[in-house]
Design a protein with these regions (language model features):
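Active-site beta3 strand of CheY-like receiver
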Residues: 47-52
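Two-component/phosphorelay signaling modules centered on CheY-like receiver
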Residues: 12-31, 71
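Helix N-cap/capping motif at the beta->alpha junctions
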Residues: 32-41, 61-65
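Receiver (REC) domain active-site loop signature in two-component systems and cognate sites
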Residues: 57
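Composition-driven recognition of glycine/serine/threonine/acidic- and proline-rich low-complexity segments
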Residues: 89, 124, 131-244, 249-338
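A Lys-centered signature of the CheY-like receiver
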Residues: 104
């Protein structure tokens, strides 16, 4: 009997990759949702006996979706598929009723093993002939997927890997956003930063990276109001001063920049060499941190990730800027996702 399954993810790239990862012999009808609210509506329509659920989405995220499914006792088996691989993420979704958790990028063998545990799929010597074409048609019905969708999904996975490292280091839960990806003129970037200035001051670090025809700079902009709680998490009991704050800044930037750049490199199957970190400034307005940078290009692919830590006043922005010359190579490297 054909099983209706539902793939819920705000990324068209992720939905397509999830559909292509399904076992070839599984007799299914594949449906798609872009957020949790759409998924709930489709489950009510009988279109999701199995739900593959992302966590970080607009409108209704994965955690909220699981809460609704539990409250309404909806008839669906939920398998969370996410780039948020923090230990607490898996614990939380299992606690909310998910059957299992699988990390992005998806490992097909791991997915098959989980599906076998549900009892809704069993490998056979003679796979169903119509199943694979049906899955392929469903994936193709996602329509055209832009390069920016692919860039965003690569950033999403790398963001989760960096958050996992920070969460394990500090024994916290890192709140993750949806990465923002834009192609900007450098002048537009500077104007955008000035427009977002608030009453807080920032301290910043910059680190360059290069490899296989792709180059750029990573900026960590740390809210100065976050130093007190960060010192507490790092178990520093002394008086805060600029030297201590600089040490905390360098520690956090090493984790987030290093892990995020490594996560992107692994997905592109390349290796980046990283330069020495450079302190941009301490206790200044966000626009001033980047105003003195000698830009060597006119356009940039900008990826912005805003990290925060649950139950602590800790916020920092990771800004990855790829050079204009890197874009053709970057496009070629992510073409497999489209």
């Amino acid at each position: 009997m054909t099983i209706p399954i539902l793939i819920c993810d705000d990324s068209g790239v992720a939905r397509k990759q999830m559909a292509k990862s399904l076992p070839a012999g599984w007799d299914v009808e594949v449906n798609f949702a872009a957020n949790g609210q759409e998924a709930i509506d489709m489950i009510h329509q009988g279109l999701g006996d199995v739900l593959f659920l992302d966590l970080n989405m607009p409108v209704m995220d994965g955690y909220q979706t699981l809460e609704v499914i539990s409250k309404e006792e909806l008839p669906t088996v939920v398998i969370v598929v996410s780039g948020d691989i923090q230990p607490d993420a898996k614990k939380r979704v299992i606690g909310l009723g998910a059957f299992d958790f699988i990390k992005k990028p998806i490992n097909s063998d791991e997915l098959t093993a989980i599906l076998q545990k549900t009892g809704l799929y069993a490998e056979t010597d003679e796979p169903a002939q119509a199943a694979a074409p049906a899955v392929d048609r469903a994936a193709s019905h996602q329509g055209s997927i832009s390069m920016f969708d692919a860039f965003q999904e690569v950033a999403n996975v790398a963001m989760g890997q960096a958050a996992d490292l920070l969460a394990r280091l500090l024994d916290v839960f890192v709140l993750l956003p949806i990465p923002r990806v834009n192609l900007l003129e450098i002048s537009e970037l500077q104007m955008a930063l000035q427009a977002t200035e608030d009453n807080d001051t920032y301290s910043g670090v910059c680190q360059g990276f290069i490899g296989s025809g792709i180059a750029g700079e990573a900026f960590l902009l740390f809210h100065d109001s976050s130093f007190k709680d960060m010192a507490k998490l790092m178990r520093y009991d002394g008086k805060l001063n600029e030297l201590v704050e600089l040490e905390l800044l360098m520690d956090v930037s090493s984790v987030l920049i290093g892990a995020c750049i490594k996560g992107i490199a692994e997905q592109l199957d390349i290796a980046f060499s990283q330069g020495h970190p450079v302190v941009l400034g301490q206790h200044v307005n966000v626009g001033d941190l980047l105003s003195n940078n000698n830009w060597r290009w006119t356009k940039t692919l900008a990826i912005e990730i805003c990290y925060s830590i649950e139950n602590y006043n800790i916020n920092c922005d990771l800004l990855l800027l790829f050079t204009e010359d890197s874009l053709p190579v970057f496009r070629d490297k992510v073409a497999y996702l489209i």
